[in-house]
From Swiss-Prot:
Membrane topology: Single-pass type I membrane protein
Protein name: Increased recombination centers protein 22-2
Residue intervals annotated with topology Lumenal: 20-161
Function in brief: Is probably involved in a pathway contributing to genomic integrity.
Segments crossing the lipid bilayer: 162-182
Pfam families recorded: TRAP_alpha
Keyword match Signal: yes
Taxonomic path: Eukaryota, Fungi, Dikarya, Ascomycota, Saccharomycotina
Taxonomy, superkingdom: Eukaryota
Polar residues bias spans: 211-221
Family from the record: Belongs to the IRC22 family.
Source organism (scientific name): Candida albicans (strain SC5314 / ATCC MYA-2876) (Yeast)
Keywords for this protein: Endoplasmic reticulum, Membrane, Signal, Transmembrane, Transmembrane helix
């Protein structure tokens, strides 16, 4: 089988299976396809995978060819469905594989990487493998895998969060500065108290007496001494 013929048929099949639903009559093939999740190989079909947005999930496929003729793996795709109503939520990007030829009675392995980026909810992942056989492209669905998808927890030390915090802090500081320059200075000038001027000690005036005073020969003021006391002193001097 020519490779150009395979790729042409593969491209035509992708164009005609929009929504990944095959058209025409269904055919039974003896090709077994299974996969494991390399990050969590212990998960089975009955388990529920737990993924976070931003994760990269690697599906490792095993294709067993039990047909009597050679087959060729040429592509892989898939879809996430709502497990309750079986509605398709999103389709995976179709990826090219190989092509990888698988002789009768043999098996091959290949990987598919899936970037998780969905609204947090419960989903069922159903991969599809494109097989070329006898100049025909066959779309073979694989088993479903239930998965719960949540948003990744944001660490306080995440560089993206730190950068955002710095931007917000600088912006906030800039707004405060502009507001102070426009309104703050004028406001504080209007409400600030006026400081009283200090008078120096050299300019301070000395106390002034309010009434006449008499200074005795002894050198002190006699105005405050009782009159009777002064008379007694005079009498003693006469004697």
């Amino acid at each position: 089988m020519k490779l150009s013929t395979i790729f042409t048929a593969f491209a035509a099949t992708i164009a005609t299976v929009a929504g990944y639903e095959t058209t025409g009559s269904k055919q039974t093939v003896d090709i077994l396809i299974d996969y494991i999740i390399k990050e969590t190989p212990e998960l089975s079909q009955n388990d529920v995978a737990n993924w976070e947005n931003g994760d990269t999930v690697t599906l490792q496929y095993v294709v067993n060819n039990n047909e009597e003729s050679e087959i060729t793996v040429v592509g892989v795709t898939g879809q996430f469905k709502n497990p309750i109503n079986n509605e398709i939520v999103t389709n995976l990007t179709t990826g090219k594989v190989g092509p990888i030829a698988v002789p009768p009675g043999e098996a091959i392995k290949f990987d598919q990487k899936i970037n998780v980026d969905l609204i947090p909810a419960n989903y069922e992942l159903i991969p599809h493998v494109f097989i070329a056989q006898d100049s025909l492209i066959k779309v073979i669905p694989c088993r479903g895998q239930l998965a719960t998808i949540v948003d990744a927890a944001v660490s306080f030390f995440d560089p993206r969060l730190i950068f955002l915090e710095l931007v917000l802090l600088i912006t906030f500081a800039g707004l405060i500065y502009v507001g102070y320059e426009i309104w703050g200075k004028q406001y504080f000038k209007g409400v600030a108290p006026v400081k009283a001027k200090k008078v120096s000690a050299a300019k301070a005036s000395s106390p002034v007496a309010t009434g006449p005073s008499t200074t005795s020969a002894t050198g002190y003021d006699t105005n405050w001494i009782p009159e009777s006391h002064l008379k007694q002193k005079k009498t003693k001097k006469v004697n």
